[in-house]
Amino acid sequence: MPGPSTLRWLAAGVYAAIGAVAAVDPARVPAVFGGTAGTPESRTEIRAVYAGIPIAFAVALAPLRGRGTAENGGMLRAVRDASAGMAIARLAGAAAERRLRLWPTGGFAALEVGLAAAAHQAARTG
């Protein structure tokens, strides 16, 4: 198993990539799920949520010097819980719709579980 710093950087990189794509090409986010972002307001909303939150997670996950152990642990647990919550909500939504495709819903749920696991392991060992 990679060390806590590696896990943090890996998860931070994934969240930074998600945020960057949403910031630069917000129409791509709903397109993955068969939707559109046809208005400036919808694209702004996508940037706020699908870029802003992942970028905040990436910053929180980056192992920066000067943060105390409690602060680091708290940030890791918050990102872990948010990632797990997204996976649970995604799977609950699929159950409510009685439809779970491997892509994109299953793929994103698996990614969120993996990110939650990485943050959990980093918090335990770091």
Predicted feature residues:
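Short amphipathic, positively biased membrane-proximal segments
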Residues: 1-126
